[in-house]
Design a protein with these regions (language model features):
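Flexible, surface-exposed loop/linker segments and immediately adjacent secondary-structure boundaries
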Residues: 95-142
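Gly/Pro-enriched, hydrophobic low-complexity segments
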Residues: 123, 127-130, 134-187
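Short beta-strand segments that buttress and anchor functional surface loops
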Residues: 42-44, 69-73, 89, 143-149, ...
Length: 187
């Protein structure tokens, strides 16, 4: 009988050590923000009822809580900077510049804020406009974001973040008009 009890205790200990703790929103933010910041390669696919086929772009991303810079390498060279108050576009080789103030394009601000905050791991800021449900543990996780404020609900259907450890790997943005953008951050 003692052998049976020891075997059961060992099995329970094995299960307890092998199962990681389910993450909370605050823990996921801490995990993501604890990651070293650097540039990341990305591949982004945009699907839309207004496009005859999906459009895929590739390049590098650099993110901070205040800015997301997307340097597109293909299919054409360009740079997008999403700042807190505006979006900037720079054409190939630095030629041609445009900026859009978010005060003049509030719908664009919603999309820019989501992208900027998600890639920076700023879940606390996202929680102001979204209900966030985290699934998984520190090894493999996902976060579902459902809009809850009128401004965001008008633009977005849902957001999904997927990752492993302290690394965001996939950002999926589904817009109300049927558009879907899937951004994969590559190792």
């Amino acid at each position: 009988m003692t052998g049976w009890i020891r075997a059961c205790a060992a099995f329970i200990l094995y299960l307890a050590l092998g199962v990681a703790h389910a993450l909370t929103v605050a823990e996921l933010q801490q995990l993501l923000q604890g990651a070293p910041k650097s540039e990341a390669r990305y591949e982004e696919t945009r699907e839309s009822p207004w496009l005859s086929s999906p459009v895929t772009t590739r390049g590098t991303l650099r993110a901070t809580p205040q800015m997301l810079e997307k340097r597109v390498e293909s299919p054409r060279e360009e740079t997008w900077r999403l700042l807190e108050d505006r979006a900037e576009w720079i054409g190939p080789g630095g030629g041609g510049r445009k900026q859009i103030l978010f005060s003049q394009a509030p719908a664009l601000q919603v999309l820019a804020d989501v992208s900027r905050r998600a890639t920076a791991g700023d879940l606390a800021a996202l929680a102001r406009d979204f209900d966030i449900v985290v699934r998984g543990d520190e090894r493999v996780w996902s976060a579902q974001l459902q809009p809850r404020t009128p401004d965001v609900t008008r633009q977005l259907e849902s957001i999904e973040l997927q990752g492993t450890g302290n690394r965001l790997q996939v950002l999926i943005v589904v817009e109300r008009r049927g558009e879907r953008t899937t951004t994969r951050l590559l190792p």
